[in-house]
Design a protein with these regions (language model features):
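Intrinsically disordered, low-complexity regions
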Residues: 9, 154, 173-181
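Terminal or standalone catalytic/regulatory effector modules within metabolic enzymes
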Residues: 176-192
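Short N-terminal helix-initiation segments at or just after the protein's N-terminus
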Residues: 8-14, 73-76
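Catalytic beta/alpha-barrel core
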Residues: 1-10, 79-80
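Short, charged, surface-exposed secondary-structure boundary motifs
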Residues: 11-17, 37-40
Length: 192
């Protein structure tokens, strides 16, 4: 099970974390507290660290915590992309937690959002993001995620990529498969 969610607010920590422990669930940790959502990534890291430490007090391991670092809109905050990439990297390397990002948050208010979201996803994955909240029906987003998997070595032998994008030879007028470079069996037989 995955509990959605706990924040750094004391009353939420006291209510949610015992339930997470009782049921052996994982939990989404939102990087805000009583002061709200900070634009400062160091503050959001500190809130996440507080949640992870409190969860440890209940015996909840870091690997069962999925931190949402709260992606800010790049159209409003110029450095939002750089900040969240650094924050995701810190969460993964220093706190050893999983992360999730609302991919479309970064492109809020901008045109051609899918292009921005696709770029964001590949960079966030390279920074250590382990999951994302995104639309799996947008081809550009799917292609970006799959290409990042290839580049990061998460798609051995590019098998998923090839399976998804390899073109099937077209049928000829006679109903037989087209004779591309790969289909040499008939030619060899004829030459013998």
């Amino acid at each position: 099970a995955l509990v959605n969610s706990v924040t750094g607010e004391e009353d939420r920590l006291e209510t949610v974390l015992p339930l997470v422990k009782k049921y052996g669930a994982a939990v989404v940790a939102i990087s805000n507290d009583e002061t709200g959502i900070s634009q400062d990534p160091d503050v959001r890291f500190a809130v996440a660290k507080k949640i992870v430490e409190r969860a440890a007090d209940y015996g909840i391991p870091a690997c069962d915590i999925v931190v949402d670092p709260l992606v800010m809109p790049i159209g409003a905050i110029n450095q939002a992309g750089v900040q969240v990439m650094r924050l995701v990297h810190r969460l993964r390397t220093e706190l050893k937690v999983n992360t999730t990002c609302g991919a479309s948050n970064v492109s809020f208010g901008l045109p051609e959002r899918n292009g921005i979201n696709a770029g964001f996803l590949t960079m966030a994955m390279a920074s250590g993001m382990t999951s994302a909240i995104t639309n799996p029906l947008h081809a550009e987003v799917v292609r970006a995620i799959m290409s990042a998997d290839v580049m990061m070595g998460h798609d051995p032998d590019c098998a998923r990529w090839i399976r998804k994008f390899r073109e099937v030879p077209a049928m000829g007028a006679d109903g037989e498969m087209g004779r591309g470079r790969r289909d040499t069996s008939n030619r060899r037989r004829r030459e013998s």
